């Protein structure tokens, strides 16, 4: 997600360039119909493990060697991504100054980035090294998404994405249930990937583990408001709408929060517009989002998603 605006600016600067994007298959649907990308080269990382890894890795390396680009841009900044650039036969490899795991040794040009910068701002600096000109308007050429079968677009609903890979960033079952209860009778659609089970109230549409990435994008575009923990889907929402609240327990919203000045963030019991983050005083040490925090959030969201008269 964070790389989309950078690649869009590179395309504007180099309209005749042949751009190939190396990407993990699970995120490849984000590039469907992207006018800035000519080719998608899948990196099936999960298949390169175990006893049969060589049988998959060797053919992939052979195909990757055929790419031979004039320039490879390492937006990930890891040894693995730098090695992919090297294997591709790129004439030059550009990366960022905060790259890790020794990946900087592979770079021919290094973009100077600051520690406290947002990921998007860091990636834009790398794009500048490739000739892009950064302006205030950024493009996120996301697909429109795929409709979810048997899902009614009306009445309006709130989309809740409460799960993250880090357990400490996820919302508890009690918070999810309290969130649904406070917004009844308005529908609360719960999405995401999780093995956890919770007791969904009557107004909850429980879609955990039941949506593809493209179906999730479709739901994000339809939702009256989105509440999400710090995650990939949150960043998708930030690119689509400002009707978003991003919940940050331990992460710094200045660095990894929504890159949308009109979106909202929650941190340590505070609700702030993203545009207020530069001057706001926020405690570095975070805490979990608790059931006592739900009414505070509900006061923000309820005026934006009023109860449909047909439900009263």
Model-assigned labels for residue ranges:
Residues 1-312:
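Catalytic machinery of carbohydrate-active enzymes
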